[in-house]
Design a protein with these regions (language model features):
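...with weaker cross-activation on analogous glycine-rich loops/strands in unrelated enzymes
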Residues: 48-101
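Solvent-exposed, polar/charged alpha-helical surfaces in well-ordered, non-transmembrane soluble domains
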Residues: 38-42, 68, 113
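N-terminal capping segments
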Residues: 9-61, 94
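Aromatic- and glycine-rich peptidoglycan recognition patches
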Residues: 20-30, 83-118
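Sec-dependent signal peptide recognition
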Residues: 2-8
């Protein structure tokens, strides 16, 4: 009788693992893998750790009044700098963490919360 119980326990233990829940504040105050703000800070030569969060750029510099070349564009969870304008009218944005990489591409500014000169 004991042998089947031991075998069953051994079998079941092969398919279980320790589940460890993360503390609900594990990434308190920022998104876990967001690095666009940190990249832009380095790219523009502004070594300020508070600029690691994209939204912090909405208070940096002064209001540009709208998009333009050299303007930092801020979305709720992303930030980049405008480097040009495509023939179709879209602004060309240079940013980090755009699809997990540093990219320069035409992009809509819809949903932007700030345009800043820094």
């Amino acid at each position: 009788m004991l042998k089947p119980v031991v075998l069953a326990a051994a079998f079941l233990s092969a398919f279980t693992y320790d589940a460890q829940a993360r503390n609900h504040r594990h990434h308190y105050g920022h998104r876990a893998h967001a690095w666009c703000g940190s990249y832009l800070s380095s790219y523009l030569g502004k070594p300020d750790r508070r600029l690691a969060l994209a939204r912090a750029w909405a208070r940096e510099g002064y209001n540009a009044g709208g998009p333009g070349i050299g303007v930092v564009v801020v979305w709720p969870h992303h930030v980049g700098v405008i480097t040009g304008q495509a023939p179709n009218g879209q602004w060309i944005i240079h940013s980090g963490n755009d699809g997990g990489a540093v990219r320069t591409r035409p992009r809509s500014t819809a949903g932007a919360i700030a345009f800043r000169r820094v």
